Amino acid sequence: MSFKDLRSFIDHLEANGELKRIAHPVDPHLEMTEIADRVLRAKGPALLFENPVGKTMPVLANLFGTPKRVAMALGKEDPLALRDVGELLAFLKEPEPPRGFKDAISKIPMFKQALNMPPKTVRNAPCQEVVVSGDEVDLTKLPIQHCWPGDVAPLVTWGLTITKGPRQKRQNLGIYRQQLLGKNKLIMRWLDHRGGALDFKDFKEQHPGERYPVVVALGADPVTILGAVTPVPDAMSEYAFAGLLRGERTEVCKALSCDLEVPATSEIILEGYIEPGEMAEEGPYGDHTGYYNETDEFPVFTVTHVSHRRDAIYHSTYTGRPPDEPAMLGVALNEVFVPILRKQYPEIVDFYLPPEGCSYRMAVISIRKQYPGHAKRVMMGAWSFLRQFMYTKFIIIVDEDVNCRDWNDVIWAITTRMDPKRDTVMIDNTPIDYLDFASPVAGLGSKMGMDATNKWEGETDREWGTPIVMDEAVKQRIDAIWDDLGIDDAPTL
């Protein structure tokens, strides 16, 4: 099942008990965050606040608050099925020629999907049913959430920022938070390595002093939203990838003020420009780390046009100490990463980004170890293979007999298979998340790798312990007589 717009997905969630409408007036200032946070921690439904205090537009929150809803957005019921998305991405990143006739036949579905890649341009798009421009633009009329008591101002959180660089054929979609600065101004908080910032940098070099056109889409269809947070190949547009996932071309329309294309069924579109040199201090804001971050200067986005659907819905979220919505997205997207990593490193059994680690700051990887030093090779590969793991501070490598998603198993492996000096890798002066105030320098810090695998000859001179495992035949005999023993519940093994 694919969803043409956000509204059809909302209807689907509601029909399946995954969305709750809240008619009681709720204030976007702090109250929505408190309600959404309580519901998310209880693994509850998405929320549609129908009567935001002081505003006329309803607010959608916790849309991707469980891995199940992320899977549902892609027409799947089980988050594990998201590995199909990872298989597709692995194919796109490194397509291989067929190894024979059968292999060629097996790849036909992927090549057919590729036909859905180019976006489809439409006219009379729903996102442009209502248009205001110039002096009529007033962003304070939107129900923009003020999430935490220490936040400096309301914050746009789920906007898809659309940019294009002079050297790129594709348009880039990225999600960057945007501080409300005035009736027609937002602060565009994009870090230097992100796609939008790189496009802007290239534009300034080729067109010095010129205004840079930018568009922000709020409330796009769920597949396009997820396409913007998925690690697509650098040369591919998120629109093209969304078309692949959906099985239908992404519908776009030309923006009102520039040549950028916007998701045609979006709820709200903000169009405008960045004036080179116009900067403003951004923050502080409560972030996904669970702390308020430092302030810094970022470009100012001047909004010249606001268009939206009739009876538009404002899509929002909050970030805070995990679990939050980004952490739940991370749990779901974890399954996307597994096939991508396995294609490059077939020895990887499983890969886990614990949500407690702010979605990406720690990774645990289980491998089929094949030679001394193998764990260290996988560490280095994981740090360098995907840009998404550039900020991963800690990597733990375990053997295939350890469930890398079970801390009981992982801690057992660390405490029985590791020597802190021999099996710890420390690397200084590496890229680190700008928001990580624990690093000695903003954006630059260290990484730690932990080899919690069994040690081979060459890694130790000691006789290595053999794990205790019950005889399989005995286990089967006990399984057969368990009900006769009068013990209420058999433990899950």
Curated annotation (Swiss-Prot):
Active site: D287 (proton donor)
Annotated metabolic or biological route of this protein: Cofactor biosynthesis; ubiquinone biosynthesis
Cofactor note: Binds 1 prenylated FMN per subunit.
Subcellular location(s) of the protein: Cell membrane
Residues annotated to bind Mn(2+): N172, E238
Reaction equations catalysed: a 4-hydroxy-3-(all-trans-polyprenyl)benzoate + H(+) = a 2-(all-trans-polyprenyl)phenol + CO2
Sorted UniProt keywords: Cell membrane, Decarboxylase, Flavoprotein, FMN, Lyase, Manganese, Membrane, Metal-binding, Ubiquinone biosynthesis
First-listed, main subcellular location of the protein, grouped into a coarse class: membrane
Record's bilayer topology term: Peripheral membrane protein
Recorded coiled-coil stretches: none
Annotated positions binding prenylated FMN: I175, Y176, R177, R189, W190, L191, R194, G195
Disulphide bridges: none
InterPro entries noted in UniProt: UbiD, UbiD-like_C, UbiD-like_N, UbiD_bacteria, UbiD_Rift_dom
Biological process (GO), any one: ubiquinone biosynthetic process
Gene Ontology cellular-component annotations: cytosol; plasma membrane
UniProt enzyme class: lyase
GO molecular function: 3-octaprenyl-4-hydroxybenzoate carboxy-lyase activity; metal ion binding
EC number: 4.1.1.98
Cofactor(s) named in the record: prenylated FMN; Mn(2+)
Gene3D superfamilies cross-referenced by the UniProt entry: Single helix bin (1.20.5.570), UbiD C-terminal domain-like (3.40.1670.10)
Family: Belongs to the UbiD family.
Summary of subunit composition and partner proteins: Homohexamer.
Name used for this protein in its record: 3-octaprenyl-4-hydroxybenzoate carboxy-lyase
Gene, per the UniProt record: ubiD
